[in-house]
Amino acid sequence: MMRIALFLLTNLAVMVVFGLVLSLTGIQSSSMTGLLIMALLFGFGGSIVSLMMSKWMALKSVGGEVIEQPRNETERWLMHTVAQQAQQAGIAMPQVAIYHAPDINAFATGARRDASLVAVSTGLLQNMSRDEAEAVIAHEISHIANGDMVTMTLIQGVVNTFVIFISRVIAQIAAGFLGGNREDEGESSNGNPLIYFAVATVLELVFGILASIITMWFSRHREFHADAGSARLVGREKMIAALQRLKTSYEPQEASSMMAFCINGKAKSMSELFMTHPPLDKRIEALRSGEYLK
């Protein structure tokens, strides 16, 4: 219920801002061109801002600390491993951070391949062997080398635009049909504003769920490729061993907004369709079969 309430409040805020911008710019919401322009701005705007601020937001979310100078042998090993793998993958040295969490996890983020961040949990450093940890780091390096963060932003922007545009087009038609078109009376050609808002809200919820299935599919798909990238960098057996170790880990404690960036996603979900990560057994089987190594 809380998520639905937050969605409705967010949608209300977006529609208010949306309406204000349309009014200030003089764009008629009944104009398909104007509506598409605003849908593109709102659809891509949030995704691009999130991407540009991703390192700062990620570090704040988990309370991570960037290693400026290694203070002990573990940090020296971590910095050396990241530097070595980044060179192998042909990318610039990412920033390296450690955050306190009991679960075995790590993530990579950043707006560009050559301005990225790799962060690992204390649980990973304490509970994984060096070979297993190397494989996890290689998985994150592969995400960066593959440009997954930018691709996810583009996909999210496209589906956001689709949701905003289609929802409002249908809402506009419904409001005009059910509430009557009052443009001749000097009022908005959107028809009854209450019907418009109600229909747009419901459709955004429905289309938003469908859109999340698309983004979650891509998120799972890129995990298979990052696993394969890790196997190429450090060896298939090391990556398989790392995934097997993840099966014994605590349930991830990272915020839901961070799950798509972590190597270990939450296992519990109503359906695999809404999972950011494939089940660990499927990832292990994909490595053993070499499906994504071809």
Swiss-Prot record:
- Look at the named UniProt entry and state the broad enzyme category this protein falls under: hydrolase
Among the GO molecular function terms of this UniProt record, one is: zinc ion binding
Instruction: Summarize where Zn(2+) binds, as residue positions.
Output: H139, H143, E223
What sections of the protein cross the membrane? 4-24, 34-52, 158-178, 194-214
Q: List the disulfide bonds.
A: none
Give the active-site positions: E140
What EC numbers are recorded for this enzyme? 3.4.24.-
Keyword annotations: Cell inner membrane, Cell membrane, Hydrolase, Membrane, Metal-binding, Metalloprotease, Protease, Transmembrane, Transmembrane helix, Zinc
| Membrane topology, record value | Multi-pass membrane protein
* Cofactor binding comment, as recorded: Binds 1 zinc ion per subunit.
Family, per the entry? Answer: Belongs to the peptidase M48B family.
The protein's name is: Protease HtpX
